[in-house]
């Protein structure tokens, strides 16, 4: 098998003009995480499944992009759904000193979480001090909750993911649990995805055989590296069975005409500007009223300054755009 891990960031994908590599892949693993983190002030989910209209980083966009659902719609324009894998994080990101939001969510903070809320941070300077990021294995966060009744799990029923909030310290951490794994399985089934990928395995949790009650030692908590989420994910995928095969693209055109159709454009995040050039090689006049149709993935909204008319028709994962010239 040939697979590739690919970005889910709209900022990166906006500059990608050639996806021809995809035809060689058996599976495409979408890294649908790190949508939000301590690199900016927006306190939002690390890996939301669906868009949330209250996401402060994307609220001004015509179409919210920082979620798995947008990444799926983008890559569905590249290859069949059964070749797409959903990325699932077994780690957290988070902030401290959070202001506003609902239990922190949609709040603001310029301070990534540190200390006990950041045991997987990077030691960038090699001095033993971890760069604040709120990065932790999931099992560590469960241990923190065992020792702190004010550290609580909340559920965002729009994005279909949980998060953790400590109201006294104003700390927010993204999270994953059995409920979000079930939501991801529902999404995989609904979209006919090929499965999932995980980053990173030692973030999953299980009961610790070396548990010492009351201990605050990282290795003596109630939970440690385990397989709780991975087992649930595996059982859910097995129960789901094989994917359906997507239908082949069909050409519904009438009699072909000897013309060239070239689409060129440029990208200025989050907008694309395209020019359509049609060159007539028939030696005869093409009379007014001709049409050009194409499928546009639902990761984008079509707007046009086209001099003729156009229509937009729902076509599953795509919108079929039909341009009609003037007389």
Segments from the language model and where they lie:
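Substrate-binding surface in catalytic domains of secreted glycosidases
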Residues: 1-130
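Conserved, mostly hydrophobic/aromatic
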Residues: 28, 86, 188, 196, ...
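Glycan-binding loop/region signatures in secreted carbohydrate-active enzymes
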Residues: 39, 45-48, 54-55, 88-187, ...
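Low-complexity, Pro/Thr/Ser/Gly/Ala-rich linker/spacer regions in secreted
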Residues: 235-260
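Short beta-strand elements of extracellular/lumenal beta-sandwich folds
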Residues: 260-285
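Surface-exposed beta-strand/loop patches in extracellular or lumenal glycoproteins
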Residues: 281-298
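Short aromatic-acidic-glycine turn motif
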Residues: 294-308
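Intrinsically disordered, low-complexity Pro/Gly/Ser/Thr-rich segments with frequent PxxP/GP/PP motifs
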Residues: 304-327
């Amino acid at each position: 098998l040939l697979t590739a891990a690919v970005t889910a960031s709209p900022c990166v994908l906006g500059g990608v003009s050639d996806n021809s590599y995809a035809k060689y892949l058996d599976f495409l693993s979408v890294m649908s995480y790190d949508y939000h983190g301590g690199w900016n002030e927006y306190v939002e989910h690390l890996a939301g499944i669906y868009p949330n209209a209250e996401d402060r980083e994307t609220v001004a966009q015509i179409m919210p992009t920082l979620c798995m659902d947008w990444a799926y719609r983008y890559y569905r324009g590249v290859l069949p759904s059964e070749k797409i894998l959903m990325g699932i994080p077994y780690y957290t990101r988070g902030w401290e000193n959070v202001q506003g939001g609902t239990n922190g969510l949609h709040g603001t903070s310029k301070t990534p979480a540190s200390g006990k809320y950041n045991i997987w941070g990077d030691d960038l300077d090699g001095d033993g001090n971890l760069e604040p990021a709120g990065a932790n294995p999931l099992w560590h966060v469960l241990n923190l909750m065992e020792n702190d009744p004010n550290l609580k799990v909340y559920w965002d029923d729009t994005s279909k993911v949980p998060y953790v909030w400590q109201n006294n310290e104003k700390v927010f951490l993204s999270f994953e649990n059995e409920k979000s794994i079930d939501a991801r399985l529902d999404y995989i089934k609904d979209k006919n995805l090929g499965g999932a990928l995980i980053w990173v395995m030692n973030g999953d949790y299980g009961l610790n055989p070396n548990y010492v009650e009351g201990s605050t030692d990282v290795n003596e908590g109630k939970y440690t590296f385990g397989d709780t989420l991975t087992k649930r994910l595996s059982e859910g995928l097995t129960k789901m069975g094989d994917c359906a095969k997507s239908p082949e693209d069909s050409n519904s055109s009438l009699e072909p005409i000897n013309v060239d159709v070239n689409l060129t454009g440029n990208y200025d995040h989050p907008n694309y500007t395209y020019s359509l050039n049609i060159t007539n090689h028939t030696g005869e006049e093409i009379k007014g009223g001709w049409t050009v149709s194409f499928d546009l993935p639902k990761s984008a909204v079509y707007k046009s300054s086209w001099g003729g008319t156009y229509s937009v028709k729902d076509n599953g994962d795509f919108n079929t755009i039909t341009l009609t010239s003037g007389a």
